[in-house]
Amino acid sequence: MIDGKKRKEEKRIKDEDLFKVVDSTIDSRTYLSLIQIARRLNIKEYYGAISSGKEAKIYPALTRDGKWYAVKIYYVSTAASKRALEKYTLGDPRFKDVKIKTTFQLIEIWARKEYKNLARLSEAGVSAPKPIYVFRNILVMEFIGEEGVRAPLLKEVPEEAITEELYNAIITEVEKMVNLAHLVHGDLSEYNIMVWDNRPYIIDVSQSVDIEHPNALELLQRDLENINRFFEGHGVNVEPVEDILGRLEISNVKGNDVYNSSG
Ligand code: ATP
Ligand code: MN
């Protein structure tokens, strides 16, 4: 009885009360999805966007029992993004049966893909946000930071915190990502790593591919070069990319041998 009454009362709460900040960029379909997600995950409030990239926006959300989530909303945008989506999803064995129709369906695949990739990272013990829920074009994950204030990106970390220890910790996460989760990030840089309590968190894995993907080695090489370039630029002694690759179990058609003999 009391439970039923309480539930009715909760439904009576005006939907607008869910949103701390009015965001006119949220379309009505996404808005309704956010309301459904709030009911499902016991979310009390969504806060203003902490980031608006080209293809996604991130909002902090607070549950009634005081947990913070990061809510990533993917947007249907340009033809370029459609091409990128196709490039990464085609060739990925997990998506070979998916018949691609509309850009909206693509964006939903994109959200599910990031969810699955985060789940693989989490299972393999890689430091990354834990996935919580995915619905349509919206992904809910663990919030990296405190009280709705996000952790800094590697790009934003103060100079004195950019150390060899941090570099090694990041390379260790990349190794776990490849050897245990069998994933290559594909867009790794100082913009897609957060640092919290001196610990790196790998984020933005929607485009990450299985190590069997035809471009996996090429992407991994570029990821490592980005990390090395960043730390070298801050005076940290880095390990040559080919040495790191030597420890990574990524032997596809193109293979490590080809890389090693040319490098
Ligand atoms: P952008 O183009 O802005 O990089 P994106 O589509 O690449 O957007 P992400 O990189 O996943 O999306 O997230 C955008 C930003 O949101 C990140 O740079 C980071 O500041 C913040 N962010 C992402 N995930 C989380 C999280 N789990 N917890 C806290 N903040 C996060
Ligand atoms: Mn990003």
Each language-model region and where it sits:
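N-terminal targeting/trafficking signals and adjacent low-complexity tails
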Residues: 1-8, 24
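A short, surface-exposed helix-loop junction/capping segment
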Residues: 8-19
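Conserved ATP-binding subdomain of kinase catalytic cores across diverse folds
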Residues: 21-150
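Residues that form generic nucleotide/phosphate-binding pockets
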Residues: 33, 37, 157, 230, ...
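Short, glycine/acidic-enriched loop or turn micro-motifs at the edges of active sites
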Residues: 75, 145, 190, 195, ...
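Short glycine/proline- and charge-enriched loop/turn segments
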Residues: 95-101, 148-159, 203-210
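Conserved kinase catalytic-core helix
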Residues: 102-130, 134-135, 150-186, 191, ...
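C-lobe/activation-segment region of protein kinase-like
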Residues: 165-166, 179-185, 196-263
